[in-house]
C-alpha cells in the first residue's frame, strides 16, 4: 500500500468533510450568530459527541482495530466475521440502553456539562430538549465507527473518510430548508444529527458487503459477550475508555468554565474548534487512520524495523505539514475567522473573540496532531495503559494552566491550556516510545529541522504582513473579494513554503513510502 497515496485519499475526503463542515458552521453563524440558541445547541451536541468519543470513536477504535487486524492476519475470514458480528451486537445493545438512560436524565447531564446555563431560563431547557433528541446518535455513530474500523483494516479508506460529509449535508439541509418552518428553528439542527448518523452508517454498507463483513446485530447480547475476541476488546476498552475519558473530562471542565465567562464564550470556542480541527483532521486523523492498521500488521508480523519506519514517516509528514498550519492559526487567525464566519449576525466583535481563541490553539497545534501519530504506536502493540498514565498527568497540568491563563486572557486561556497540555502529552508519548525501543529515528532529522525552521520563519513573516495590511473585517460588504484575497494568500503561502524547502535541498521523494 502506498502510504502517501492513502494519505491523499483520506485527506481529500476529509477536506470535503471539513469544507462542508465550514459551510454548515457559516450557515449556523449567519442564522443564529453567537447567542443563547447556539450555546444551547453546542452544549447539547457536545454531550453525545463526548459519549461517542468515549464509547465508540475513541476507546473502541483503539481497542478493536489491533485485535481485528490480528484476527484477519492470523485466523482467517470466518473468525474475523464472527468477531465483527459479536462486537456489533454488544455495541448496539449497550449504547441503546445508554441512550434511554441519557434521554431520561437529560437535565442532569446538561447541568453537569454546563452548569452555567442553569441560570438562563431559555438556554437551559433548550439544551435539555436537544440533548434528548440527539442522544440516540451514539448508537448510529458507534456502528459507523465499527464499519470504519473494518474497512480501514481491509485497507479501504474512501467510504469511512467520506461518511462525515453526510452529517454536514444533513445540517445544511436542516438549516436551509427545515429551520425556517419551525417554531424553535434551532431544533432542526438537533434532528439533523440523527439523520446524519443514520446516513453515515448506511453509506458504508456497500464497502462492507464487498469484503463480506456486513455486521449482523443479534438478539442475544449476552451470548455475543462470551466471544473471546469481544472479551479481549472489552478488556482493552477499560483502560482505553479511561484514557479517552481523561481528555473528554478536560473538555467538560473547559465547557463548564466557558459557560461562566459570559454569553457567547461557548460559541467563540466552538467556532475556533471548527477551524483548529481542519488541519487536525486533514493531517492528524488521516495519518492515524492509515497508520494504525499498518502498525498493527507490523506488530503481528514482529517486524520492528517496519514498525519504527512507519512511525518515522508519520512524524516527518506531521512536522512538514503541521508547522505551516500552526503558523496560519497563530498569525492569520483574524483573516481566517472573518473570511469564513463574518456574515449576518456574526459581527466584528465576535470575529475578534474567535480569533483570540484560534491564535492560542495555533501554539499547541503541532502537539495536538503529534498525539494522533504517537498514540497509535502504543495502541497497535495493544498497550493502552501507558497513554492512560500520561493522559492523567496532562489533565492535571491542563487544568492547573487554566488557573494561570484564564484570568489573564479569558476564554482564549482555555484553548491555550489545551495546547500546552497537548505538547506535553506528545512529548511524553515520544519519550515512552524511545525508552521502550519501539521507535528509532532514521538519519537526517537535524537537516530536516533546519530546513523546516528556515522555511517557517519566512512564511511567518509573510503571513503577519498579509494579516495586518488588509482590512479583513472591513471587507464584509465585499465577500467575494475577501474570499478571492484569502485564496490568493493561501496559494502564495503554500508556494513560498514549499519553494523555500526546495531551494534548501529538501527531498520530497522520501514521503512516497509503501507499507508492507
From Swiss-Prot:
- State what the entry records as the consequence of deleting this gene: Essential for growth, it cannot be deleted. Under non-permissive conditions, conditional mutant shows growth arrest, dramatic morphological changes and cell lysis. Depletion causes accumulation of peptidoglycan precursors in the cytoplasm.
Q: What keywords were assigned to this record?
A: Cell inner membrane, Cell membrane, Cell shape, Cell wall biogenesis/degradation, Membrane, Peptidoglycan synthesis, Transmembrane, Transmembrane helix, Transport
Q: Which residues form a coiled coil?
A: none
Q: What is the effect of changing residue 274 to A?
A: Lack of activity
Q: Where in the cell is it found?
A: Cell inner membrane
Pathway entry: Cell wall biogenesis; peptidoglycan biosynthesis
From the Swiss-Prot or TrEMBL record, give the protein name: Lipid II flippase MurJ
Question: What species is this protein from?
Answer: Burkholderia cenocepacia (strain ATCC BAA-245 / DSM 16553 / LMG 16656 / NCTC 13227 / J2315 / CF5610)
Amino acid at each position: 500500500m502506498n502510504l502517501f497515496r492513502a494519505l491523499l485519499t483520506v485527506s481529500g475526503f476529509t477536506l470535503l468533510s471539513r469544507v462542508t463542515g465550514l459551510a454548515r458552521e457559516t450557515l449556523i453563524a449567519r442564522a443564529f450568530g453567537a447567542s443563547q440558541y447556539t450555546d444551547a445547541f453546542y452544549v447539547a451536541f457536545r454531550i453525545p459527541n463526548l459519549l461517542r468519543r468515549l464509547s465508540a470513536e475513541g476507546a473502541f477504535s483503539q481497542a478493536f482495530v489491533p485485535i481485528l487486524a490480528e484476527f484477519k492476519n492470523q485466523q482467517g475470514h470466518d473468525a474475523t466475521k464472527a468477531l465483527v458480528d459479536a462486537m456489533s451486537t454488544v455495541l448496539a445493545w449497550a449504547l441503546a440502553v445508554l441512550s434511554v438512560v441519557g434521554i431520561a436524565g437529560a437535565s442532569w447531564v446538561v447541568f453537569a456539562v454546563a452548569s452555567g446555563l442553569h441560570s438562563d431560563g431559555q438556554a437551559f431547557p433548550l439544551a435539555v430538549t436537544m440533548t434528548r433528541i440527539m442522544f440516540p446518535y451514539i448508537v448510529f455513530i458507534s456502528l459507523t465507527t465499527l464499519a470504519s474500523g473494518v474497512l480501514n483494516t481491509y485497507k479501504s479508506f474512501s467510504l469511512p473518510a467520506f461518511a462525515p460529509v453526510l452529517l454536514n449535508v444533513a445540517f445544511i439541509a436542516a438549516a436551509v430548508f427545515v429551520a425556517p418552518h419551525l417554531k424553535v428553528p434551532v431544533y432542526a439542527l438537533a434532528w439533523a444529527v440523527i439523520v446524519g448518523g443514520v446516513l453515515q452508517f448506511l453509506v458504508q454498507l456497500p464497502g462492507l458487503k464487498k469484503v463480506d463483513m456486513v455486521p449482523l446485530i443479534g438478539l442475544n447480547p449476552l451470548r455475543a459477550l462470551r466471544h473471546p475476541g469481544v472479551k479481549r476488546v472489552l478488556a482493552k476498552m477499560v483502560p482505553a475508555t479511561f484514557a479517552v475519558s481523561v481528555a473528554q473530562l478536560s473538555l467538560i471542565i473547559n465547557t463548564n468554565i466557558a459557560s461562566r465567562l459570559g454569553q457567547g464564550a461557548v460559541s467563540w470556542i466552538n467556532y475556533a474548534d471548527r477551524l483548529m480541527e481542519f488541519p487536525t483532521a486533514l493531517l492528524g486523523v488521516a495519518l492515524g487512520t492509515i497508520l494504525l492498521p499498518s502498525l498493527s500488521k507490523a506488530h503481528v508480523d514482529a517486524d520492528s524495523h517496519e514498525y519504527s519506519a512507519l512511525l518515522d514517516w508519520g512524524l516527518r509528514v506531521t512536522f512538514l505539514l503541521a508547522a505551516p498550519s500552526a503558523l496560519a492559526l497563530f498569525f492569520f487567525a483574524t483573516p481566517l475567522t472573518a473570511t469564513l464566519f463574518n456574515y449576518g449576525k456574526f459581527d466584528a466583535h465576535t470575529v475578534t473573540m474567535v480569533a483570540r481563541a484560534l491564535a492560542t490553539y495555533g501554539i499547541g497545534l503541532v502537539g495536538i496532531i503529534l498525539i494522533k501519530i504517537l498514540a497509535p504506536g502504543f495502541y497497535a502493540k495493544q498497550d493502552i495503559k501507558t497513554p492512560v498514565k500520561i493522559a492523567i498527568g496532562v489533565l492535571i497540568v491542563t487544568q492547573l494552566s487554566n488557573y494561570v491563563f484564564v484570568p489573564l486572557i479569558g476564554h482564549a486561556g482555555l484553548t491555550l491550556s489545551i495546547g500546552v497540555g497537548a505538547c506535553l502529552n506528545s512529548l511524553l508519548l515520544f519519550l515512552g516510545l524511545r525508552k521502550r525501543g519501539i521507535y528509532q529515528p532514521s538519519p537526517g532529522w537535524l537537516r530536516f529541522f533546519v530546513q523546516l525552521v528556515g522555511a517557517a520563519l519566512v512564511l511567518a513573516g509573510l503571513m503577519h504582513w498579509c494579516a495586518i495590511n488588509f482590512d479583513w473585517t472591513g471587507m464584509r460588504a465585499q465577500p467575494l473579494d475577501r474570499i478571492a484575497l484569502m485564496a490568493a494568500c493561501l496559494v502564495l503561502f503554500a508556494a513560498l513554503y514549499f519553494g523555500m524547502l526546495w531551494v534548501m535541498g529538501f527531498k520530497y521523494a522520501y514521503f512516497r513510502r509503501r507499507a508492507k
